[in-house]
Amino acid sequence: MTQLNPTVEDAMLSLRSPATVMDLERLGSFSPTRLSFARRLTRLMFEQQWKVSRTQFELDEKGHGFAIYCLQTPAYRYHVVVFSRHLEDAQRTDRVIAEAWDLTFCLLEGEVDAELMSVLSANVPLQEAGRQHPRLLVISRANKSVRAFATVSTALASGQQPDIDYLKQAGYLYRTTAVYGNGKFGIADFDRLKGYQDFWQPFSAQMAAVYMLREFSVDQVEHIARQADPGRAVALHPEAR
């Protein structure tokens, strides 16, 4: 039996210490790769030509109400249901113990009929305090960047595009404060997701839900701008999206 002698390069290699690898500043500087959860999902969406459509959009002039989006893949159909409400500034916190949020939403398998919508309306806004339906794959909540949201909606309502450099300072219109999956609060367990070719990889369902939140945030801010000035309001430029 031939025994391979270690090369000089092999002898010099050694594992880095956890203190080096897990340093928070170092971790925060990592760039996305092909293995990153979001890029892996969006690559699959592009390759398979997933279709996203807005089926209901029941918002008032301030953007409060609900919206339903359909996510159609080659194999399955899913829906994302979003609930938007008024939130006092004193209630807006990113801590996990919060009990109210600007937005709550869910990703679920199949169709949304009137009976299911009634259940979702009563429970999804409550998050962990609600009785969640087992067809839900993901449940989440988010708070807005008040300044960024106001800046974008005001600019669009006046017929202008928001300043990109300013938007980069916040980087978002909404930020999730928790994204739950894998059986949390009674929703579908990961074992169930293994049967779906769309979401069998870890965190892919969660990333799909967050992707749809991003779409809703743009739809909502454009809606608010149109309500403020129907004659001058413009849509957000694709480069800003």
Regions found by a protein language model. Name each.
Residues E25-K51:
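Acidic-basic catalytic patches of nuclease active cores, encompassing PD-(D/E)XK
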